Amino acid sequence: LGAAEYKEAALRRIRRLKEGGFNAIRGAHDPRSREVLEACDEIGMYVMEESFDVWYGSAGVYGYTLYFREEWEKDLELMIRKCFNHPSVIMYSIGNEISETCTEEGIRYGHEMTQLCHKLDDSRPVTLGVNLMLNILAAQGKGMDAYGGSVMNKADVVDPKACEPDSDQNGSVLVNNMVADFADYMKNVNKPENTDGPTKGIFGELDIAGYNYGEASYEKHHEWYSDRIMVGTETNLMNMKERIEMVRNQPYIIGDFIWTGWEYLGECGVGVIDYNENTGNYNKPYPCIVAGCGLYDLIGHRDTLEYDLMIAWGVRDKPHIAVSHPKHAQDEMIPGLYRSTDAIDSWSFEGYEGIETCVRVASPGKEVELFLNGKSMGVKLLEDLYAEYLVPYEAGILEVVAYDENRNEIGRDRLVSASNETVISVRTEKETMDVGGCLLYTSDAA
């Protein structure tokens, strides 16, 4: 809500995440407000409290990099003192995707920060979200300057709010664009034998090794460093079932933080699906203003992929139907970097009668059966939670039934086409509100 935080809004966000199966949040990539920490204390949500998104290396235009060396100790101490009496805070993170951590100076700063955390609070472990690929590139001299980044100097600052439209790419933005453009190359480079050297120094200073998109290195790194405790500090939703099983089955991996729980402004279109033409990997043109990868949208509605996660976690015990818009039936889909589908839970596509569209079912169990207006569209075995049908659009009721291995029904989901009449209703989420509080509501169209 802009630069302001409200108790009711914080409680609502944390409550929605908790209801959706999350048991921990990571403050990405700056400290959380007191209201958020109080909400986590009240509701029961673990917190990884994170201090910095940059250190002294250039990342972003004239930001904290300019002041890091003189301010980090004071700011880190303030964060720890704020968190000390909040039981929800279970660990501290001293940074995110800091490529300097592949250098001696960066490792020294990591050591000093970890020691300060231990001095002020020896009850909580310390981690850092290391982007393994970013460290590989930096160790090879292919850091920000080599790929178009710029070195920031205080003397250059004329207008802190100014930003040239053709300004250089830095940090995570640069790496994500490189990943999109050179996916095969990155996959070949991002192997355990390559990620070890540029990360073992900083990991040796931390209580818990934080891996950003580094799950391919978990197993080998554990073989080489059997006492290393790991956490997936940042991952995307690709292969999520496999990752969930990995975390459950490997005691040295304590958890997995997914990018991202709540939708946000900026990094425009990183999770937006295109058709026929890629309009940009990380900077799609206006009117795209959101990232498009939140499991909850800006006002807290669940995304299709959040339902998938709930099923994978075992929080939801029935299927979920999502449908691709039939207007794209003949188009080539171009997935976003952080999204593989734009299907939604709707069966209202007036004007597209008879056009085949993809119906995507996520479900627990062994198999599912889809019905359109009472007629079976067939039984399909689930593959990694999913089954897909091509169904000609016809207004009415689309329903799916999930079965276990003994063909016993375990749950249903249904979509009903909207009528021609539009009705706007507003319902409050609470019957009462505290004096001085803010009213939270959702609007529904039926």
Identify the function of each model-found stretch.
Residues 42-45, 377, 418-419, 446:
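Active/binding-pocket-proximal capping segment
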Residues 1-57, 61-111, 122, 126-127, ...:
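Active-site-adjacent substrate/metal-binding segments within catalytic domains
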Residues 441-445:
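Conserved small/polar residues in nucleotide/adenosyl-binding loops
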Residues 90-92, 115-118, 126-437:
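Substrate-binding clefts and catalytic carboxylate motifs of secreted carbohydrate-active enzymes
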